[in-house]
Design a protein with these regions (language model features):
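C-terminal accessory segment of soluble enzyme catalytic cores
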Residues: 160-219
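A structural signal for short, well-ordered beta-strand segments
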Residues: 88-90, 126, 138-140, 151-155, ...
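N-terminal lobe of the biotin/lipoate ligase/transferase fold
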Residues: 1-129, 134-135, 185-186, 214-219
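Short, conserved beta-strand/beta-arch hydrophobic-aromatic motifs that form part
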Residues: 53-57, 135-156
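Active-site donor-binding loop signature of nucleotide-sugar glycosyltransferases
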Residues: 11, 140, 180
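A short secondary-structure junction signal
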Residues: 50, 100, 140, 163-165
Length: 219
């Protein structure tokens, strides 16, 4: 089994976390262990390569709330990131991959919500849904056979901001979070440990090195 490095960024703004992700990508390209970065972001809207300015359906609300809109190089459309949502960046060499990367991540998200007795469904696009409402999102980029970007899983986050976008290019896409589905107060730290366990099992890793980096509340 391969070793998996874990980097927990706590809460970090999107740009700063992206810098860490790209630094880790360079390290993995040079031979470092595959790495899973976990983070929460302050409110931000990101638009992937499949999205455009038309992904924003209520720009006045976004401006009023002071929410940054950032175009990224990942796949997919527009997605909201905010506190109470677990974001993960698996930085992995595809040449060593035992299974399809996107499918493995989607299946891991399903494994995680199943721990809380929540049954999820898959759709035509990467992600998971619960009773027709999207709860897990996946958007990746591959550079020199190394993956970047990754997934987001709604845990206890405010869902109002999703109404201002076409989530993943789908008009009027309903969304939900794990707290709404379980009526439980879910610890983010506990959720991270569950995800690490399920991810490691899916991809045949041994979590080996845990690195905690100090986050920032900057937008």
């Amino acid at each position: 089994m391969k070793k998996l490095r874990i980097i927990d960024l706590d809460t970090m703004d999107y740009h700063a976390a992206g810098e860490v992700m790209r630094e880790v990508r360079d390290e993995v390209e040079q031979g470092a262990n595959d790495t899973l970065i976990l983070v929460e972001h302050n409110p931000v809207i990101t638009i992937g390569s499949d999205g455009s300015e038309f992904s924003i359906v209520d720009s006045s609300y976004i401006k009023k709330q002071g929410i940054p809109v950032i175009h990224t190089d990942r796949g997919g459309g527009a997605v909201v990131h905010n506190n109470g949502q677990l974001v993960g960046y698996p930085v992995m060499r595809l040449s060593d991959m035992p299974l399809d990367l996107l499918k493995g991540i989607v299946d891991t998200l399903a494994d995680v919500v199943a721990v809380f007795d929540v049954k999820s469904e898959k759709g035509a696009e990467p992600g998971i849904w619960v009773s027709g409402s999207k709860i897990g999102f996946v958007g990746m980029k591959i550079h020199n056979r190394v993956s970047t970007h990754g997934f987001a899983l709604n845990i206890s986050n405010d869902l109002d901001l999703f109404r201002a976008i076409e989530t993943c290019g789908v008009k009027n896409e309903r969304v939900t979070n794990l707290t709404l589905q379980t009526r439980q107060l879910i610890s983010m730290d506990n959720l991270k440990q569950i995800f690490i366990s399920k991810f490691s099992r899916r991809f045949n890793y041994i979590p080996d090195q845990f690195i905690m980096k100090e986050g920032t509340d900057a937008v």
